[in-house]
Regions:
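Extended, low-hydrophobicity, polar/charged segments
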Residues: 1-170
Length: 170
């Protein structure tokens, strides 16, 4: 019999994230997780390791909106427009969360935060730019492991609201 711990050990995924995948019936996603000893802490590192476009990496950023944590899923090639996040949430103030708040909220360290399977239930926003690809890669709970997933499935399993919060260029 396999357990989240043995699955996590085989895949390189964090045990909490492996358990979340099993609870969602996503064992096949766990089987596709890939561990890279050189690390996938940043979107650029993950894209280089996987061999995909930077925009195919789903990065997760944690913000504090009027003191309440909110998670934003963004494609790896884009930047979050904090003013758009503020407007989307109707918040007076939105700031980047520090490492302590990230770990307290999600249960994971910066550079390995997955899109779901967090310690606490938190509001999640997903930028529409993620839908431009058939598959995106996201962290599997460690700064060395990523997994592929269809963007709409990622948004659904994260319980995210689909929004437009990326910075506009030019």
């Amino acid at each position: 019999m396999t357990t989240a711990a043995t699955d996590a050990e085989e895949s390189g995924a964090h045990p909490r994230f492996a358990e979340a995948l099993r609870a969602l019936g996503l064992d096949e996603v766990l089987a596709r997780a890939r561990r890279f000893p050189e690390g996938t802490r940043t979107a650029a590192e993950a894209a280089a390791a996987v061999g995909c476009a930077l925009s195919q990496i789903c990065k997760l950023l944690v913000f504090a909106a009027d003191g309440t944590p909110v998670l934003v899923l963004m494609d790896g090639a884009s930047r979050v427009d904090v003013d758009r996040v503020r407007a989307e949430l109707g918040a007076a103030k939105v700031t980047r969360a520090d490492a302590g708040l990230v770990r307290e909220t999600t249960g994971y360290a910066i550079g390995g935060v997955p899109p779901f399977g967090h310690r606490t239930r938190t509001r999640v926003l997903a930028d529409r730019s993620l839908l431009a690809h058939e598959v995106v890669w996201a962290a599997a709970g460690t700064p060395h492991t990523v997994f592929p997933i269809e963007p709409r499935a990622l948004v659904a399993h994260a319980g995210a609201d689909l929004v437009d919060v990326r910075e506009r260029t030019g």
